[in-house]
């Protein structure tokens, strides 16, 4: 499904842990890393596509994550001319993406890159929040920068809530006398 401007509707997924690190996934058989992403099927909402891609690419279900935010607008990137398939109709010149920020609520051991018949990724790791902006392939950098700027406040709030829980002593306080 390509829109009238030549862009394929797509969802992107940023998964974070309680420390504010983000999941960085290695493309299958390559040394190229990125966030999970995938196309939106006809008749599918962006949120439905996100949950489908979440399972297909990292083996997680709705119960395993919590949605913290989504981008207000569609973000676009153009493919380099060498990657455009000029012989297909309609020609896809890039992607327009709706991004979702998810908090991992399950154990890391529940992540399964082999959950679909044709895996997109063969490895992953936690990286610092801004690391992907510097490391992603150059034509996606502007979109990644915009996504991470838009999602920084929910991530900071998450980190602060975790820090507050750690700093708060558990159990009743005893009165010293």
Swiss-Prot record:
Motif Nudix box, chain ranges: 38-59
Function field: Accelerates the degradation of transcripts by removing pyrophosphate from the 5'-end of triphosphorylated RNA, leading to a more labile monophosphorylated state that can stimulate subsequent ribonuclease cleavage.
UniProt cross-references to NCBIfam families, sorted A to Z: PRK00714.1-1 (NF001934), PRK00714.1-4 (NF001937), PRK00714.1-5 (NF001938)
Membership in a protein family: Belongs to the Nudix hydrolase family. RppH subfamily.
Listed name of the protein: RNA pyrophosphohydrolase
Cofactor(s) this protein cannot do without: a divalent metal cation
Uppermost EC category: hydrolase
Record keywords, A-Z: Hydrolase, Metal-binding
Start and end residues of each Nudix hydrolase domain: 6-149
HAMAP family in the record: Nudix_RppH
Name of encoding gene: rppH
